[in-house]
Amino acid sequence: MIKVTDLSKNYGTVEAVKSISFNIQDGEIVGFLGANGAGKTTTLKMMTGYLVPTSGKIEFNDLNIIDDTHEIQKQIGYLPELNPLYMEMRVYEYLEFLAGIRKIKGRKFKEALSRVIEECGLRGVVHKNIADCSKGYRQRIGLAAAMIHDPKILILDEPVTGLDPNQIVEIRGLIKQLGKEKLVFMSSHILQEIQGTVDRIMIINQGEIVANGTSDELMSNFMGNVILNMEVKGAAPETIEHIQAKVPSVKFVSLNTSNDIQQIQFEYGKDQDPREDLFRYAVENHWTILKMTPHTTNLEDIFRDLTTESDTHA
């Protein structure tokens, strides 16, 4: 379990992270979502012991990141946003080098190498130079490097950014598989990259946590009113003017007319559905309905509403 309490980081007068608190349970895959510069990387660097907080606590079970940095780092596999690979090395040489730093040698290294090659799908490139591998494979190599010591926790900073759609699907599938056995905390600035992968989403904006929950919980907590777009023919102006009096559950928003087609927009509450009443009113007033399309808030809308331009220092 990871417990973050009142965590802050200042760069001079700039508050990159502002007293954030959250918990992550073992076995969870949690997405950390925010615009560029919102504070994601700063938070991850503090959690992995590479950046000292200005204030607050980060605890891994009974260990504190300040007092027990090296012990915690033994339990963490960290993939930074800029994947630190030695391009001139072969894949197995790079993994052997990193394993050696962690004092994993001999038979233990062979077992660890075999495990990460299998888990990360590297069998076809293990003897290739890293420079000759595609970006998707380089991300897999970075994941293998983060996992060579079989950590309980994976912290991944934008692991699928810059990959093509097929590579994104592959890496997401790999992360989901790894999440069955490990705690995974991964950041992104693109909702679609993590939505189908994680159990829970936290949204950070300008250094503050502005949302935290499952997709369903976020939809329930932040979903706004429904916008209904209607296209009709033959609607007399006075019948449009009177519609709100006849169907009080809707709010008239706008009217545009083009080539005898009226485009009318209404708004109503998420717990209401006035479409039958609107249809009945249209029939009574001899409208021809061409289209009736509701637009409900989705996670992308919620993300856009909750995030604004952040400070680039974060």
Please give the residue ranges for each predicted region.
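Generic structural signal for isolated residues within well-ordered alpha-helices
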Residues: 71, 97, 115, 217, ...
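Short, charged/small-residue-rich alpha-helical element at the C-terminal edge
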Residues: 227-299, 306, 314
